Amino acid sequence: MNNNRFMSSSNAQATQIDLGLRSYMLGVYNHMTTALALTGFMAMGLNFLAISNGALTPIGELFFLSPLKWVVILAPLGMVFYISAKLQSISSEKARNLFYIYAGLMGLSLSSLLLVYTGESVVRVFFITAASFAGLSIYGYTTKKSLSGLGSFLIMGVFGLIIAQIVNIFLASSGLDFMISVIGVLIFAGLTAYDTQKIKNMYYAADDSETAGKKSIIGALTLYLDFILMFQFLLSLLGNRE
């Protein structure tokens, strides 16, 4: 009798954890998807206002040719550092709002890609990235194998990638640029799986609803960055230039 009660209690607890995990991960993906939609809307909106009859409008000149372009480029970086620094001291609702502001700023920053690549190739690469991301994230969620070792290796790879990009600013080597793009795709593909598993494991810590909400936001931000960076590297490889 006692054994049956214990088994019943264990099964009920496991079911509750499973349902809670699904709800938590769904929240992460919902925040991420909303942020991506906002990024796309802002990028296309600015591009629409910046280009007329194949030439830059005054708004386009302001955002892409004036010193304001550096604010547009660097604002997302400043925002992500601000969110990371303030995450512990702000509410989950404010963290969510800051994340969406960051996504909007990223859209303004990425709008210049629509000046470089054809709209058709941008859309095509976006769907390639989305399909790849989905498969990799599902793998990270379902695999029983720990990816922590892979994650440490990939994070070191990110630093190497940054150094290579800085070096190539001075070398302007098309061959090195191609290698950077290939390696970048591989690194952020791996990080998508690793980060998904890490975000999933974060759920199992006993947290209050406010902390869980913040974890959901930081998880969405992490996967959002994986997606955006993988998209940019794939676009460099597969995009058709104007």
Can you describe what each PLM-predicted range is?
Residues 1-242:
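A hydrophobic alpha-helical transmembrane-helix feature that marks the membrane cores
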